[in-house]
Amino acid sequence: MFRLSNDEELDIQTLSSFISDHRFWVENRYKPLMDAYMTRYPIFDLPPKPEWKPDKRIAVNFAKYIVDTMNGFFIGIPIKIDCDDPAISEYVEFLDQYNDQDDNNAELSKMCSIYGKGYEMYYVDDLGNIGITYLSPEESFMIYDDSILQRPRYFCRIYEDADDTVYVSV
């Protein structure tokens, strides 16, 4: 967890340190978790055995089975939102349809099952509508204050463009 006291501003050195720590977490924690989900285990990267020895590398993808089964129970029936005010109910229905929230919620749930966390981001799109999407902890992280309440202070998203230029938005 990345923490910054309330009396400190986020400067470039601190942000660089957080990004470096985040990259460490991605390589050593998040990538192995996704590899387990995708059945990419280290045994498959070992050199082949001599031709006269059997080389049976079998993997049971129990991680994927557990994640998919539990998410089917958890979010298999889409979330239903009811409201007494018809105007609010109509807007919430529009938001759900516009952003395909059933799929977003299923993906976010799966992400949380794989990594232990995931992020939902709200934004205003180019048409002026509220957009909702999910972000993986491999590409984003939250910076909290150092209080007992751990209030969010900053959210960082790390992404690449088509030219492989890395950007960080805070």
Predicted regions and their residues:
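Extended, helix-rich architectural segments
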Residues: 1-134, 149-150
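Extended, regular secondary-structure scaffolds
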Residues: 119-170
